[in-house]
């Protein structure tokens, strides 16, 4: 009997070791700069195209107002208004090629390193809901998950973003080609039904109200919409955390209850931020995007509030666990995460 028990224990240990070895073998790390080498010129050009559109618009309007006749200035304003509403061909070959260039060179500026706990857990014939945190000033690390970066085995990916993005001239074209789309429930549901995996940033712009220096904030407790949609569609939830993203800009925001009331009223946090030489270009600080294992979600067309809260709790717990297990590995051993 004793020999049999020892034999069983040895088998259990062997199986346990095999599972651990398999997990390690499925763990994937990809550094953007090693995969897509760049230089200062290409990196800064890509970043300027990606996030400099708003500044370009304002600069052009300002220069036009100062140096051109008033009728010409009005023509330029009218042109921008047209760009706000003109339909976009999201499958444009030129646009897609531009954004492939932008994504790959911009990521290599920092660089961004993608960590996937189990690459074999993702299948090209399935759609997933990625919950990405934190938002920070800009969620720049999310670009490493796009199909332009071409690491995850998911050929159809979309990032859900605020509707305000799609009313901004030039920016709406570039970000649409880069895979961003409007964050409405109707759009979200239709994309999942069509086989698209969707990346959601649950904390959204409101998360920036609570940003703190030296720690990370995830505004999740009141965010159940993405969980409900995942349940209604029966799509796995995937926790994702980006380490270092909060360091690519220096920022300042006023404190106090009055500021919070104003920010909530305008649905925007008017923070002051700056990067390279005080510009809008982000600092060259490394980021690590860690993708956890999918949480299987049973399809439930009409989940109750309690059922949604239960699955939301599973997601939050998985995100916290992901954060704690990887923070030392990527150089942030003392960093803390607060869930609000």
Curated annotation (Swiss-Prot):
Report biased composition (Low complexity) as residue ranges.
Answer: 7-16
Principal place where this protein is found? endoplasmic reticulum
What organism does the UniProt record list as the source? Answer: Ricinus communis (Castor bean)
Location(s), subcellular: Endoplasmic reticulum membrane; Lipid droplet
Q: What is this protein called?
A: Diacylglycerol O-acyltransferase 2
Q: What does this protein do?
A: Involved in triacylglycerol (TAG) synthesis. Catalyzes the acylation of the sn-3 hydroxy group of sn-1,2-diricinolein using ricinoleoyl-CoA.
* One protein family per Pfam: DAGAT
GO CC terms, sorted: endoplasmic reticulum membrane; lipid droplet
Q: Which domain of life is it from?
A: Eukaryota
Its taxonomic path starts at:
Eukaryota, Viridiplantae, Streptophyta, Embryophyta, Tracheophyta
The protein's topology relative to the membrane is: Multi-pass membrane protein
Q: Which reaction does it catalyse?
A: an acyl-CoA + a 1,2-diacyl-sn-glycerol = a triacyl-sn-glycerol + CoA; 1,2-di-(12R-hydroxy-9Z-octadecenoyl)-sn-glycerol + (12R)-hydroxy-(9Z)-octadecenoyl-CoA = 1,2,3-tri-(12R-hydroxy-9Z-octadecenoyl)-glycerol + CoA
Q: Which residues form the signal peptide?
A: none
* Transmembrane segments annotated in the record for this chain: 18-38, 41-61
Q: Pathway it belongs to? A: Glycerolipid metabolism; triacylglycerol biosynthesis
Its keywords, alphabetically, are: Acyltransferase, Endoplasmic reticulum, Lipid biosynthesis, Lipid droplet, Lipid metabolism, Membrane, Transferase, Transmembrane, Transmembrane helix
Q: Which family does it belong to?
A: Belongs to the diacylglycerol acyltransferase family.
**Enzyme Commission no:** 2.3.1.20
- What gene does the UniProt entry assign to this protein? DGAT2
């Amino acid at each position: 009997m004793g020999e049999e028990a020892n034999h069983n224990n040895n088998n259990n240990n062997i199986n346990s070791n095999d599972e651990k070895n398999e997990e390690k073998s499925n763990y994937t790390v990809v550094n953007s700069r090693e995969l897509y080498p760049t230089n200062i010129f290409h990196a800064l050009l890509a970043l300027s195209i990606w996030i400099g559109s708003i500044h370009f618009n304002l600069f052009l309007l300002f220069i036009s107002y100062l140096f051109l006749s008033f009728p010409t200035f009005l023509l330029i304003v009218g042109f921008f208004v047209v760009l706000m509403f003109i339909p976009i061909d999201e499958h444009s070959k030129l646009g897609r090629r531009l954004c492939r260039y932008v994504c790959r060179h911009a990521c290599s500026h920092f660089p961004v390193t993608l960590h996937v706990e189990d690459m074999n857990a993702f299948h090209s014939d399935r759609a997933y809901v990625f919950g990405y945190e934190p938002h920070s000033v800009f969620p720049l690390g999310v670009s490493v998950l796009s199909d332009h970066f071409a690491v995850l085995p998911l050929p159809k990916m979309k990032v859900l973003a605020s509707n305000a993005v799609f009313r901004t001239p030039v920016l709406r074209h570039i970000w649409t080609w880069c895979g961003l789309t409007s964050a409405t429930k109707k759009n979200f549901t239709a994309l999942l039904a069509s086989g698209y995996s969707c990346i959601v940033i649950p904390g959204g712009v409101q998360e920036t109200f609570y940003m703190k220096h030296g720690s990370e904030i995830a505004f999740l407790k009141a965010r159940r919409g993405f969980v409900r949609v995942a349940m209604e569609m029966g799509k796995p939830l995937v926790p994702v955390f980006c380490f270092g993203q909060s360091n690519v800009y220096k920022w300042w925001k006023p404190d106090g209850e009055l500021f919070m009331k104003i920010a909530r009223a305008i649905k925007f946090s008017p923070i002051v931020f700056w990067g390279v030489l005080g510009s809008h270009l982000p600092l060259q600080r490394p980021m690590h995007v860690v993708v956890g294992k999918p949480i299987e979600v049973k399809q439930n067309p009409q989940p109750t509030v309690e059922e949604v809260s239960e699955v939301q709790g599973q997601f939050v717990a998985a995100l916290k666990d992901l954060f704690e297990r990887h923070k030392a590995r990527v150089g942030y051993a003392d960093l803390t995460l607060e869930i609000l």
